Amino acid sequence: MGNYLSVAVELVCGLGILFIILKLLGKTQFSQITPFDFISALILGELVGNAVYDHEIKIKEIIFASLLWGVLIYIIEFITQKMKSSRKFLEGEPNIVIRKGELQYKVMKKNKIDINQLQSLLRQAGSFSIQEVEYAILETNGMVSVLPKSDFDKPTNKDLQIPSKSVSLPITLIIDGEIVRDNLKEAGVDEQWLKQELKKKNIDKTEDVLFAEWHKNKPLYTVTYEQSRST
């Protein structure tokens, strides 16, 4: 029983330490990850994971090792912010893999990327043919940024001489049958208005709604549990 309790305490402490360190280091540890970010997060996770199941290592040692690793990563991140020359070495640099519509084979080979991988990355960026691309930049996080050729670029309202309209963010009002009350205030509506809108759609209870979204000047969008099960 004592061993189980010890593992439980170490897991909770390890989780808390990792969470605090990631909050301090910023979102780059789990979003838009670079090779260095990946290595640092992997080692930090392994450090705590191995320590949890090694009964000879005490909680104080886990905390010390994790905090020391966090401090080292923070120092390196600080250096990359202050010294531009260090960024290329630690984080890498963007590379142009398509320039003026032409594939840059040497750059692709240098970055260990083949045609199939490039096509997949282009599709994720919204381009389904290499012929549509004027420039494609392989970013340090492994994603591709695309500048389409003018013939394939989407026309803007300005191009079509259409008067611009103000835009607003869609706001989720119901998730899993529960009203998100903070979002009601954000949308400038109340619970009574929401129930009235649901009645217009022949929905009697909010518990029947899987998802509901408000968007300015648009009707309330809803998906009921019944609808989701029938598709």
Curated annotation (Swiss-Prot):
Keyword line: Cell membrane, Membrane, Transmembrane, Transmembrane helix
GO cellular component: plasma membrane
Classification via InterPro entries: DUF421, UPF0702_alpha/beta_dom_sf, YetF_N
Residue ranges of the TM segments: 5-25, 33-53, 59-79
Short name of one Pfam family: DUF421
Membrane topology: Multi-pass membrane protein
Keyword Cell membrane: yes
Annotated localization: Cell membrane
Family per record: Belongs to the UPF0702 family.
PANTHER family the UniProt entry points to: UPF0702 TRANSMEMBRANE PROTEIN YCAP (PTHR34582), UPF0702 TRANSMEMBRANE PROTEIN YETF (PTHR34582:SF5)
Protein name: UPF0702 transmembrane protein YetF
Organism, as annotated: Bacillus subtilis (strain 168)
